[in-house]
A protein has these predicted regions:
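Extracytoplasmic metal-acquisition and chelation regions
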Residues: 2-332
Length: 332
């Protein structure tokens, strides 16, 4: 009887120890699994979308969109948690330029060699910021204020950072990001190449559709009652543009003088559509439309996306496709 009690005790202890060991192993496995995930952090939506397409269904990669939907990239400043996220990343992708001056300070603080860092603008042919017809002047940091109507010089060496708006640059960005993923996760290189090629095919398809609209245009001028962060797009399709502000402006309310200028341009050239960009209410565009008989329409510049579009999984391709109908009406 005593022997049976001892054996029962031994069995119970063994069961308890087995459970503890299994729990420890499972805990370590989970911890290791989370730790082993490849962490990729990007600053802007276009790079996020391209990487999302390249990575595909790979659950071993954790992709973070630092800016997040619904926010203005020009006024963004990283939080303490954002800095930690970048520091813990295997790959950090940023655009640079005036829009992301904060990145310089962040990069200086990173541990050397811990995080692979790429400035995606290095992989495309950038252009200097251009003066836009109708655009009000805006101040760059450390520049003197210019009176309205005065010639304005952009900061020396400043480039237009809205590189993703042309299909040509979008393809270059996808190729560059795919190669970076190969570097940090070579075992999945074939999958990354395949996914990148599929996405590039989609970009080429939407490019072809937009080019067809441009080929059949009645006019070549787009009018923005807003800032105009689409110079690469405008140059790529050989269009003309008038806007209230250039692409780097943080202003949202144009002066009466600027509104009058745009209204006159619309009336003189019989412009059918007044454009405003995502995350804007379109109030100014609607005001000008009411005065001129034109129609106010939103165009997607992929500067960022709304929370709704983000949650619905909208992409560079789907948002550019949304622009096709807008362009048909604007260029008729």
């Amino acid at each position: 009887m005593k022997f049976k009690k001892i054996m029962l005790l031994v069995i119970l202890v063994a069961i308890i120890l087995t459970g503890v060991i299994i729990g420890i192993v499972a805990s370590k496995k989970t911890k290791t699994s989370n730790t082993d995930k490849i962490k990729v952090t990007v600053s802007n939506f276009a790079s996020y979308d391209f990487l999302r397409a390249i990575i595909g269904n790979n659950d071993n990669v954790e992709l973070t969109f630092l800016l997040g939907p619904g926010k203005d990239a020009h006024s963004y400043e990283p939080t303490a948690q954002d800095l930690i996220t970048i520091q813990n990343s295997d790959l950090f992708v940023y655009v640079g330029g005036e829009m992301e001056k904060w990145a310089d300070k962040v990069l200086d603080s990173l541990e050397t060699g811990k995080t692979e860092i790429i400035c995606i603008a290095d992989f495309v042919d950038t252009m200097e910021e251009k003066e836009v017809d109708g655009a009000e002047e805006h101040e760059h940091e450390d520049e003197e204020h210019h009176e309205e109507g005065e010639e304005h010089e952009h900061e020396e060496g400043a480039f237009d950072e809205h590189i993703w708006t042309s299909p040509e640059n979008a393809i270059k960005m996808v190729n560059a990001l795919e190669k970076e993923m190969e570097k940090i996760d070579s075992k999945n290189s074939n999958t990354y190449k395949e996914n990148a090629n599929k996405y590039i095919a989609q970009i080429k398809d939407v490019d072809s559709k937009i080019q067809d609209v441009v080929d059949h245009k009645v006019r070549d001028r787009l009018v923005f009652a807003d800032k105009m962060p689409m110079q690469y797009f405008i140059d790529y399709y050989k269009l003309q543009v008038t806007a209230a502000f250039d692409g780097c402006s943080t202003e949202t309310e144009p002066s009466a003088k600027t509104i009058a200028y745009i209204e006159n341009k619309v009336k003189e050239e019989k412009i059918p559509v007044i454009l405003y960009i995502e995350l804007n209410t379109g109030a100014v565009a609607q005001t000008i439309a009411n005065e001129t008989g034109a129609k106010a329409m939103q165009i997607q510049t992929l500067h960022n996306v709304s929370k709704t579009d983000f949650d619905n999984g909208e992409t560079w391709v789907s948002l550019m496709e949304r622009n096709i109908d807008v362009l048909k009406k604007a260029l008729q």
